[in-house]
UniProtKB/Swiss-Prot annotation:
It is an enzyme of class 1 (oxidoreductase). The keyword Oxidoreductase applies. SUPFAM superfamilies: Glyceraldehyde-3-phosphate dehydrogenase-like, C-terminal domain, NAD(P)-binding Rossmann-fold domains. GO terms for biological process: catabolic process. The lineage of its organism: Bacteria, Bacillati, Chloroflexota, Chloroflexia, Chloroflexales. InterPro entries: Acetaldehyde_dehydrogenase, Acetylaldehyde_DH_C, NAD(P)-bd_dom_sf, Semialdehyde_DH_NAD-bd. This is Acetaldehyde dehydrogenase. CDD domains: ALDH_C (cd23933). The keyword Coiled coil does not apply. It comes from Roseiflexus sp. (strain RS-1). Its EC number is 1.2.1.10.
Length: 305
């Protein structure tokens, strides 16, 4: 594709890395995928990449570091692995878009702060639950202060690969922190449930938000519906299953009107089954964030020319 694109690589040839590969090939935008690197030479992801003409390696991060032309790296490995990767990528001046809960860089949720950290060399996409639910908490907090937000993400057990299962503890901490830092809640709590039901269920999320004071329910409802429409621009299967509910409850902060929103995420079916909306929203968010970084790198290149 030449000088009109930014060369990118994917670290991790599991479910998330492979699905992201399909998204980047189908809608490359300003990016050119030049490498999919994993550590299992027999992984399905590497085999699929080779069949599609994408360069592959089973040498992990080492293969990326050998390619100086790669400017953006999507890390779809694990939180523990990314801690090491982040240091190496930073030392070589690569932009890391972290799809693990390692959180070595600032959080990014596209409909909330897509362009806020374009000078960072490492940004974190929090978790699938964070990408799905933080926009709704933010939608409430931009109308009225939120003293507490709690989310419950239920995903199909079959959609949770080894990386997801290794990251369960980091998921709860990082998502809860994201509810506060990006969502705007004074206190956040996150719960994830792996549901073994057959046939597998779609990703389902319950969001509770307790406003600190009085508010106009119509404004909150409109704010939620507006941000859902924003997310649907890059995750078409993202939708509310019912209109937001407002009901009075006894809470640790006194008797308050609690906002409850129910949503589900259906995947696009690029590589993963449509029930794996939890993984699809991560890869869709990653592609969106990567495109913004790539456009900025290209604009800087034009200025230098």
């Amino acid at each position: 594709m030449g000088d009109e694109t930014i060369k990118v690589a994917i670290l991790g040839s599991g479910n998330i890395g492979t699905d992201l590969m399909y998204k980047l090939l189908d809608h490359p935008g300003s990016m050119e995928l030049v490498l999919l690197a994993g550590i299992d030479p027999h992984s399905e992801g590497l085999a699929r990449a080779r069949s599609l003409g994408v360069a592959t390696s089973d040498q992990g991060i080492a293969a990326v570091l050998e390619r100086p032309e790669i400017q953006i790296v999507f890390d779809a490995t694990s939180a523990k692995a990314h801690v090491r990767h982040a240091k190496l990528l930073h030392e070589t001046g690569r932009i890391a878009i972290d799809l693990t809960p390692a959180a070595r860089g600032p959080y990014v949720v596209p409909p909330v702060n897509l362009t806020q950290h374009l000078d960072a060399l490492n940004v974190n996409l929090i978790t699938c639950g964070g990408q799905a639910t933080i926009p709704l908490v933010y939608a409430v907090s931009r109308v009225t202060p939120v003293c507490y937000a709690e989310i419950v993400s239920t995903v199909a057990s079959r959609s949770a690969g080894p990386g997801t299962r290794q990251n369960i503890d980091e998921f709860t901490f990082t998502t809860a922190h994201g509810l506060e830092v990006i969502g705007g809640a004074q206190q956040g709590k996150a719960i994830i449930i792996l549901n073994p039901a057959e046939p597998p269920i779609l990703m389902r999320n319950t969001v509770y938000a307790i406003p600190a004071g009085d508010f106009d329910p119509a404004q909150v409802r409109d704010s939620i519906e507006a941000i859902v429409a924003e997310v649907q621009q890059y995750v078409p299967g993202y939708r509310l299953t019912n209109p937001p509910v407002f009901n009075m409850r006894e809470t640790p902060w006194g008797r308050k009107p609690v906002v409850t929103a129910l949503l589900e995420v259906e995947g696009a079916g690029h590589f993963l089954p449509t029930y794996a909306g939890n993984l699809d929203i991560m890869t869709a968010s990653a592609r969106r964030v990567g495109e913004v970084f790539a456009q900025q790198l290209l604009s800087r290149r034009e200025v230098l020319v």
